Curated annotation (Swiss-Prot):
A biological process term (GO) from this entry: translation
The name this protein goes by in its record: Large ribosomal subunit protein bL28
Record's keyword terms, sorted: Ribonucleoprotein, Ribosomal protein
SUPFAM superfamilies hit by this protein: L28p-like (SSF143800)
A GO molecular function held by the record: structural constituent of ribosome
UniProt key word Ribonucleoprotein: yes
InterPro entries (UniProt xref): Ribosomal_bL28 (IPR026569), Ribosomal_bL28/bL31-like_sf (IPR034704), Ribosomal_bL28_bact-type (IPR001383), Ribosomal_bL28_sf (IPR037147)
Alphabetized Gene3D superfamilies for the sequence: Ribosomal protein L28/L24 (2.30.170.40)
Ribonucleoprotein recorded as keyword: yes
Pfam families linked to this entry: Ribosomal_L28 (PF00830)
Ranges that cross the membrane: none
Amino acid sequence: MSRVCQLTGTRANNGMAVSHSHIRTKKLQQANLQQRRLWWAEGNRWIKLRVTTRALKTIQKKGLGPYAKSLGINLAKL
């Protein structure tokens, strides 16, 4: 399973680790992904999703159905 948020599509970022002597080495900054079982009220069922914690905060604020609709995601296919 790839490390990608199923709702937002957030993935790893390429960055640099810089030491005190300014030696730079490549580093991957992974997204904070969590496997969650979320209740979808409109579909009247549970949905398992791998989402970022940022997406979880937005789901708590807006709700799963409206948030997925704003992103153009059909939850019935998941």
